[in-house]
UniProtKB/Swiss-Prot annotation:
Ligase found in the keyword field: yes
Top-level taxon in the UniProt lineage: Bacteria
One Pfam family in the UniProt entry: GCS2
Protein name: Putative glutamate--cysteine ligase 2-2
Stated family: Belongs to the glutamate--cysteine ligase type 2 family. YbdK subfamily.
Length: 369
């Protein structure tokens, strides 16, 4: 059974005013110093600075079951909230700030170079995603997985969609984070590579163009991890509910296992161009699960419920083998019935027309057990 791990980028807000709080770097520093002073072990959790001061990232220890993943996410969010409290803040699972924000760059030489190169893109770039790492056996298997998961990543994005607001406005998108993130020139879907060598050649060609500063700026929707034997699926919004995060991560683990078995059996990767996948992802970003998604078998729009049923059917053998099918099906049904985080944010705003209510509602859901 493959291990899988989660990283969440979380928005840092003032515990009293609920406005974004530019103290992420200090919160991480104080968290680290507190553990060093007491000699306590953070238990495999890693809290690190992110691009802007109004956020930081939590990396959770890898797990093998959905149940353990859920408890890990809940504990990690509580740990992050404790770190935020050291600077008078809270952390909330919001991919974008609902209200207007001019974020503050973390003082870091690399980030400063990125800012100098990419200008206004950096000045507005405050987004929080969630990334899923799934264990792979070799570089060849890793790239084979990337080639085959591509067509399903818009569905993953739709399930996670949780960012309708940007700079104080309802964008009409379910995931505007994905739109904002795709301002980066290396972001988005990739074409089929075919081999690990071809993947490395593609990376080298992008880096030789002199636009991305380093391999860390190759922001593909899915990529081979530089530091661990994993593939990293990067398409999802950070989710309000820990249960949704755990289930989406579980779906991605099952997807990786399914396509790895297909590769081992000699089945070819679906040859859908990246330019077409961009449109599939755009639709997922625009509507989430509220309208039609693209059926990967036909390339045509179909009701979201039908596309999700097809996704679950495709993964059913692995989910059943791992004993996770029942919980996953129930959670996906809940998302279809109650909506993703985007619907819940809009409902919170509609009640009184106050963006601060979006944040307070999101805080309650983020830390609900």
């Amino acid at each position: 059974m493959r291990t899988f791990g989660v990283e969440e980028e979380l928005l840092l807000v003032d515990a009293v005013t609920f406005s974004p709080l530019p103290a992420g770097d200090r919160a991480v520093q104080l968290h680290t110093e507190a553990h060093e002073a007491t000699g306590t072990d953070p238990g495999g959790y890693e809290i690190t600075r992110e691009f802007q001061q109004e956020q930081f990232e939590v990396a959770y220890p890898p797990q093998t079951t959905l149940a353990d993943q859920l408890e890990t996410i809940r504990a990690g969010r509580a740990l992050a909230d404790t770190a935020a409290s050291r600077v008078g803040g809270r952390v909330v699972a919001l991919p974008t700030s609902p209200g207007p924000i001019s974020p503050h760059l973390v003082p870091n030489p690399r980030y400063q170079r990125i800012s100098e190169r990419f200008g206004f893109t950096v000045k507005e770039q405050l987004t929080c995603g969630f990334h899923i790492h799934v264990q792979v056996e070799s570089p060849a298997e890793a790239v084979a997985v990337l080639d085959r998961v591509r067509v399903w990543l818009p569905v993953v994005l739709a399930l996670s969609a949780n960012s309708p607001f940007w700079q104080g406005f309802d964008t009409d998108f379910a995931s505007y984070r994905y739109q904002a993130w795709n301002r980066w020139p290396t972001a988005g879907p990739t074409d089929v590579f075919g081999s690990a060598d071809a993947y490395e050649q593609h990376r080298a060609a992008l880096l030789s163009a002199g636009v991305p500063l380093d391999p860390g700026m190759l922001y593909f929707d899915a990529r081979v991890c530089e530091h661990h034997p994993t593939v990293e699926i990067r398409v999802a919004d950070v989710c309000l509910e820990a249960e949704h995060t755990a289930v989406i991560a579980t779906l991605v683990r099952a997807l990786v296992e399914t396509v790895a078995r297909e590769w081992a059996a000699g089945m070819p990767a679906p040859d859908v161009p990246a330019s077409v996948l961009q449109l599939w992802s755009w639709r997922a970003s625009r509507y989430g699960t509220e309208e039609e998604l693209i059926d990967q078998a036909t390339g045509q729009p179909a009701p979201a419920a039908e596309v999700l049923a097809g996704f679950l059917s495709y993964l059913r053998p692995v989910l059943s083998e791992y004993g996770e099918l029942e919980v996953v099906e129930a959670t996906v049904a809940d998302i279809l019935r109650e909506g993703t985080g985007a619907r819940r944010q809009r409902a919170a705003y509609a009640a009184r027309g106050r963006l601060v209510d979006v944040i307070t509602t999101a805080l309650d859901i983020t830390h609900r057990r």
